[in-house]
């Protein structure tokens, strides 16, 4: 998710160039680049979808140079977190009803990235054990 404005970080973060597109940590990468790199350790690059507002399409494509327009879930209006996650979930479900979704906000601080990756891998394994389909007829 990379659609918020980050108004608490004004004047660095603005509606035209919000915090996820800045190197807020002084690490040589913007927040969205760090998040994409972290998730790319878990998920093939082509399976990473970025939910953002239409106004940030060019910023995302400029900063995530290996990303294609097909990977962007462009929200026509900012409606906060829950609608963004629902939109992504519906998109994934329509492409793969058995797909597993990881929600990763682009502005989260992860202190121990190795532990974070291990925990996500464990969660993926748990989800794989839970996936099933049902042929049960409606009552």
Per-range role (PLM):
Residues 4, 27, 138:
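Active-site beta-to-alpha loop of glycosyltransferases that engages the nucleotide-sugar donor
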Residues 132-139:
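Conserved small/polar residues in nucleotide/adenosyl-binding loops
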């Amino acid at each position: 998710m990379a659609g918020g404005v980050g108004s608490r970080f004004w004047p660095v973060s603005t509606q035209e160039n919000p915090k996820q597109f800045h190197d807020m940590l002084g690490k040589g990468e913007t927040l969205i680049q760090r998040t994409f790199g972290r998730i790319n350790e878990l998920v093939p690059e082509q399976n990473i979808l970025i939910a953002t507002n239409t106004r940030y399409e060019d910023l995302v494509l400029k900063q995530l140079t290996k990303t294609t327009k097909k990977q962007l879930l462009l929200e026509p209006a900012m409606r906060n977190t829950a609608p963004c996650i629902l939109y992504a979930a519906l998109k994934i479900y329509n492409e793969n009803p058995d797909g597993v979704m990881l929600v990763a906000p682009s502005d989260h601080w992860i202190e121990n990235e190795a532990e974070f990756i291990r925990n996500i891998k464990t969660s993926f394994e748990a989800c794989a054990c839970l996936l099933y389909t049902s042929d049960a007829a409606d009552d």
